Each structure stands twice: as structure tokens, then as C-alpha cells.
Amino acid sequence: VVMENFDSNEQMYIKVANGESYDILVPSDYMIQRLIQEGYLQKLDHSKLDCLDKLCEDVVGLPYDPENEYSIPYFWGSVGIVYDKTKVDLEDLEREGFDIFKDQKYKGQIYLYDSERDSFMMALKALGYSMNTENEGELQAAYEWLVECVQTMDPEIVTDEIIDNMAQGRKALGLIYSGDATYVMSENEDMGYY
């Protein structure tokens, strides 16, 4: 078995689009949809998958592959905030939510995940908009929110290194996937997930 890890869906997409061949890919929902639309995925042979009837109904038949012809769920989670309980006031998190990433109290103490999709989700949620909006005004406001955050908060923009860095308590808070946050919290009892 040869396994190759990618820092992002986009890195994986470039390899696939340039002709690299893989037996199994583990991308996110939006990338599955793109790979299907562009003809890069083969249909699954459901007769060889004895687990289909055991999958949670909440994660099958999703809009990007309604019949699960090309994909089955591997895991699911959310994007949230990992924080150092010794450095971040829980009341700040509860009051500010994602706006905590613009709280000057934490300037220079934040990680942002190097993902356009996740960053825009954070900004849209902070502004009270749907993370799936197509409204140009809302998207522009989210862009401006992100620009202000980067220009005023001195964030470190990272990918998977956030996991070990937060486990070691190097910053106060960061945008992270829930599964990664679970690992961080298992390594450092001072860490929480919001």
C-alpha cells in the first residue's frame, strides 16, 4: 500500500487533474462534487461494500453525491476554535464567537487555517451570514473581515502544524477541525474546543 498525504483538497486536485492515479481518495464534500463533475471519479461497486447498510443516515445521500455512487463517508466533523484555557477567557468565546479572531487581546496569539473555504466560513459566521451564501455583498463583507483580521491581528496561517503547535500551547487559539481538536485536547488538558 502506498499512501500519500496532502495539505489540502486543492493540492490533491492538482495531482489528480494532472493525471496522477489513485485507488482511493479522501477529500471533503465540495471536492468530491468537483471531482464527480469533472469526471475524475469512477462509480463504486456497491456489491463489494458490506458496510453501506451500517452507515449513519445523516451522512449518506448528501447533495454532492445523492445516491453515493462515487463516495461513501469516511468521517465527519466541524470547524471550530481550539483554545488554551489558561490564555483565553471562555466568556470571550461565548460572547464573541468567531469574532474572537479580531479581539486585540489575542493579537499575535492566533492560528488561521490556510483554507479559503474554512476562512470564509469563519468570517461569514462571525458576520451572521450563512456559510453557503452566494450573495456578493455578504461575500465581500466576509473578504473585508478576513483582510482586517490578517492586517490587524498578526495571525500565523498554517495547515496541519496547528495540531502539534496547539498541543504544545504555542498560541492562544486557532481555527481547527473537530477531529484535530480532539487530538490536541488528548495531548494537553489545558486545551478546549468551542
Regions found by a protein language model. Give the residues of each.
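Small-molecule pocket liners
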Residues: 77-80, 121
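Ligand-binding pocket segment of bilobal, Venus flytrap-like solute-binding proteins
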Residues: 111-115, 119, 123, 131-194
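Hinge/lid segment of periplasmic solute-binding proteins
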Residues: 33-76, 90-102
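Early extracytoplasmic/lumenal segment of secretory-pathway proteins
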Residues: 1-34, 164
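Short helix-loop capping/hinge motifs at secondary-structure junctions, enriched
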Residues: 86-95, 128-134
